[in-house]
């Protein structure tokens, strides 16, 4: 028995396989009623989207849809900031892309800082966000760009890479990826050497981002730490920052301390806005969606 949704975002391998299988018209049962939408207007809008009637779906939402032009990020952030503290806790901002997510988080954080909801001098961090590259995409030099981080999680990885971390320096004239290892040595890596039949996830590509966190900020984990009850995609609240030590409350209500150089300090990001990849599987009572007409697949 296989269960899947061919409408999943394209970079997800499982979604692609279900789309291919269904294109051959196998015997299958369809579940056309979504249980995630609870209100009548959202049930109607979701049903129209599944039917490919996008214009009609937006029209059914009426005044709930706001066209804000070039100021759509600013208007979205302001809509969330106008909510009561109780409604903020149960309202997510869904963004159509990673750039919009970063901008929305910054705007919301600035608004919270101005009203005193978050406090302190803040702690500047370099965080890592998944590049969402599939195994096949990792075989092409065009997937890599300067400033990214490549993590090799096992020995005898493709291209002779050993376990460790590598900074992506760029692409040379022969299409090889220039990597700098943890000792500072420059290595030329040919991604085409990756065996397409190798299903082991030996490589993980991430993008570096600068984040500032304050006391009271809401963050979201991009990786897990089972021992401390920090689960990927779950949210946590920053309780305090002192002498470089971050004290937070995890989803279970437990207090956790992260000292300087703790690997989980780079595996977090602000959680006021999340993009469409992060939103898969996320269910909220209320939501504010930001989308741009150019982001057709993500919107």
PLM feature spans:
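Conserved ATP-binding/catalytic motifs of P-loop helicase motor domains
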Residues: 1-299
